């Protein structure tokens, strides 16, 4: 069998069009032989060059080695092996074939080993205002395309913006809740770039003078609390939305349409410092940030509808180093799971490039949920690329101390405060209290129920075990807290059984009928009359002689089956405790 590790040195030199002397050639032959032997042992796979017809331009290869992504460099040299020490090839993963083809990043804890990840997040939160940031158009989601537009938000010449005071108050509220300094003077600027969904050719944002500076979001992971610092919170208008025809994204689509309904919808952008060190912390940051914004009532927090959007900047550096590495931006992460997976993938990809000696370039990449990979979108812009300058149509924004204090006075308790209170007052365990902390809708429903029903423990049990099994989005919940409280009181009083209660809830959600309607139109009174239950028990015993014989022979577990049969015979209305008592007596008799 031909030993494919024996490479014709003349052909190798000819491939690269290198000029070497005889002595250099002999030295090169010796070094290459040693290297090939090492590579054969390490890779466990034969080594071979591409066919002779595969011409490689030396200058092109050198340019690729300096600038191009590693996959492009690989394409220049064909099916060459992935060897340690070459700056233009991907190092092989454990168990790889050594072909140099792009492979799935290893499943490792991101940031482990010699490198550590440095992550910063930029989060856009859509504010719950009724009108847009600079015009009176409504902000309602789901309207017909381009129905919520006017000359201002569609960028018509001569149309002038007027700032929405409600949006400013919401930005102040967010800043206060996160410990920011509220700047009494802030300035709107034009961020200039071209894109089809940007009708004016620029976006009105804030740059040098944001409305909020500093601040933090406190996270708790593995029972350890950390404060993730914020750089700033600033206000800006949203862009329109591209709708792609024939494909979920722009790639492969037949055409793209623009919907300007979202244009100029008010946003705040929360920019963190690069304090996040792994994907789990990034996810927890987003969980806590969403909980804060929803608790404040300033954002719906729905990532699927685009109410909350997150971009991540990630870089790697050697562990213990203080200098930041070249950052890569990741976009198109529309869920908490996507944020965690995208960061894990990208950190591993960057680690592979570091180990291969491949230069990392500043770029923007898109997360693809279907392939679970990131893909190059464009080279990352710097702030000067946007040519920021103060918007001449808007005066500087001045926020008075009185305005700030009036907003502060209306702040509700924050999620962590709520968690601590629930653990203290209701003796909830950590996981139960956390569910209320990260889901403000659950907490609001719970608090309303407590106004009518005082058993917090039983309320939480029914809330988590039954109500949430039917609907976990309390914005869509058609069961009111008042109805749910009365429903639980009927169970506590024995008017209806727990089994009946579960069936009533199931029908309420299946038929989308209010609880009080079902309770009012049907007889749900629990059967507690002993004579009626004895009659039902006698019928069941007569109908199930086999199970009765099993019970009397010592197989007492069959009692549960017989209790269920009695409950079925009475339409779930019989008192379960009394059924159990009567059955036991009659089976022993």
PLM features: what roles do these ranges have?
Residues 99-413, 424, 451:
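Basic, nucleic-acid-interacting segments
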Residues 2-4, 33-101:
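Long, charge-enriched, surface-exposed interaction segments in small proteins/subunits
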Residues 475-489, 495-568:
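Strongly charged, low-complexity linkers/loops
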Residues 306-318, 386, 423-447, 456-472, ...:
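Core structural elements
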Residues 8, 31, 432, 445, ...:
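Residue-level detector of well-ordered alpha-helical segments, enriched
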Residues 19, 452-453, 459, 466-478, ...:
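M16/insulysin-pitrilysin zinc metalloprotease superfamily fold
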């Amino acid at each position: 069998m031909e030993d494919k590790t024996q490479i014709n040195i003349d052909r190798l030199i000819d491939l690269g069009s290198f000029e070497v002397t005889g002595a250099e050639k002999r030295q090169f032959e010796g070094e290459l032989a040693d290297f090939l032997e090492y590579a054969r042992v390490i890779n466990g796979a034969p080594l071979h060059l591409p066919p002779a017809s595969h011409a490689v331009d030396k200058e092109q290869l050198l340019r690729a080695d300096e600038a191009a992504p590693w996959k492009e460099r690989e394409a220049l040299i064909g099916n060459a092996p992935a060897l340690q020490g070459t700056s233009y090839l991907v190092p092989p993963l454990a168990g790889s074939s050594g072909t140099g083809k792009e492979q799935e990043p290893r499943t490792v804890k991101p940031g482990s080993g010699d490198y550590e990840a440095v992550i910063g997040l930029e989060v856009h939160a859509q504010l719950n205002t009724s009108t847009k940031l600079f015009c009176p158009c409504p902000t309602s989601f789901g309207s017909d395309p381009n129905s919520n537009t006017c000359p201002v938000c569609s960028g018509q010449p001569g149309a002038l913006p007027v700032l929405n005071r409600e949006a400013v108050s919401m930005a102040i509220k967010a800043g206060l809740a996160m410990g920011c300094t509220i700047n009494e003077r802030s300035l709107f600027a034009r961020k200039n770039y071209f894109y089809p969904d940007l009708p004016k050719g620029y976006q009105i944002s804030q740059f040098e003078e944001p409305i909020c500076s500093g601040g933090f979001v406190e996270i708790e992971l593995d029972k350890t609390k950390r404060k993730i610092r914020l750089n700033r919170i600033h206000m800006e208008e949203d862009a329109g939305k591209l709708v792609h025809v024939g494909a979920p994204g722009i790639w492969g689509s037949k055409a793209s349409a623009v919907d300007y309904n979202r244009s100029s919808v008010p946003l705040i952008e929360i920019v963190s410092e690069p304090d996040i060190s792994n994907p789990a912390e990034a996810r927890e940051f987003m969980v806590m940030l969403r909980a804060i914004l929803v608790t404040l009532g300033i954002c719906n927090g729905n990532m699927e509808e685009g109410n909350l959007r997150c971009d991540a900047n990630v870089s790697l550096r050697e562990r213990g180093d203080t200098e930041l590495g070249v950052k890569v931006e990741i976009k198109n992460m529309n869920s908490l799971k996507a944020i965690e997976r995208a960061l894990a993938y990208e950190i591993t990809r960057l680690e592979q490039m570091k180990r291969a000696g491949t230069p990392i370039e500043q770029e923007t990449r898109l997360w693809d949920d279907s392939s679970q990979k990131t893909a190059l979108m464009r080279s990352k812009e710097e702030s000067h690329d946007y040519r920021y300058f103060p918007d001449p149509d808007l005066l500087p924004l001045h926020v008075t101390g009185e305005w700030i204090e009036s907003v502060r006075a209306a702040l509700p308790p924050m999620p962590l405060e709520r968690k601590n209170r629930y653990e203290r007052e209701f003796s909830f365990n950590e996981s139960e209290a956390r569910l209320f902390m990260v889901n403000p809708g659950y907490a609001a429903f719970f608090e309303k129920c407590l106004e009518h029903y005082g058993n917090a423990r039983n309320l939480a049990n029914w809330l988590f075990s039954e109500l949430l099994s039917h609907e976990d989005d309390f914005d869509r919940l058609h069961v009111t807290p008042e109805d749910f409280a009365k429903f639980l009181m009927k169970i506590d009083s024995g008017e209806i059984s727990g089994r009946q209660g579960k069936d009533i809830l199931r029908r309420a959600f299946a038929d989308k009928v209010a609880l009080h309607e079902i309770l009012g139109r049907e007889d749900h009174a629990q059967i507690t009359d002993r004579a009626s239950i004895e009659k039902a028990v006698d019928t069941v015993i007569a109908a199930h002689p086999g199970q009765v014989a099993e019970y009397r022979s010592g197989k007492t577990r069959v009692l549960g089956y017989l209790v269920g049969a009695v409950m079925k015979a009475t339409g779930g209305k019989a008192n379960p405790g009394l059924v159990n008592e009567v059955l036991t007596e009659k089976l022993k008799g």
